Amino acid sequence: KRIVILVHGWHSCWDLDFSGSAPFLHKEGCSLLLIDQRCHGESGGDLISYGIKEKDDVLLWLEWVERTHPGLPVYLCGVSMGAATVLMVAGEPPSGRIRGVIADCGYSSPTPVIKGTLTHTLGKWGAPTYMAIDLNCRRRGGFSLSESSPAQALKKNTDIPCLFFHGDDFMGGGCAFLA
């Protein structure tokens, strides 16, 4: 009937984030692709990019699904960083196959979360520490944390229906979506 690509969150893995929902989706007739994002679970890698590089990985998985299961509609489902990742995938030029996105507790940008956590933990050293982390990301990973913006990505493509689940202030820093 349909294929759902399930994308877990930061420092998690597919079996932790989807142990409850995967059996339900399968029972409802969905074929599932449960992946471990880079630097998580059984996947390799040494740098998490908060959805920036992971988006490209999911696009490759989407291409694989389109080759191996032609004609079946595809849905993307992500939790936390996985939600941000699938929302950025939805912002890419449409393949015509993505029929919908489920985003559970995604963020509009990781920058306020990271800055807020560092400031709360390190006080006045929070801002310089963030700058050092971002510099490390640019040098080692070829990306800046400011590139991760699911909110901006969605402005590129608004034709795909999205279902958002989110609490009120868990992520902090004002980075929850304004749905």
Residue spans of the language-model regions?
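Conserved alpha/beta-hydrolase
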Residues: 24-44
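Short beta-strand element of the alpha/beta-hydrolase
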Residues: 2-9
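Short beta-strand/loop motif that positions the catalytic acidic residue
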Residues: 157-158, 163-166
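Conserved alpha/beta-hydrolase "acid-adjacent" motif
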Residues: 171-178
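Alpha/beta-hydrolase fold nucleophile elbow
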Residues: 69-80
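Hydrolase active-site cap/lid region
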Residues: 88-146, 155
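Alpha/beta-hydrolase active-site loop
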Residues: 48-69
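The serine-hydrolase catalytic nucleophile loop
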Residues: 10-24, 37
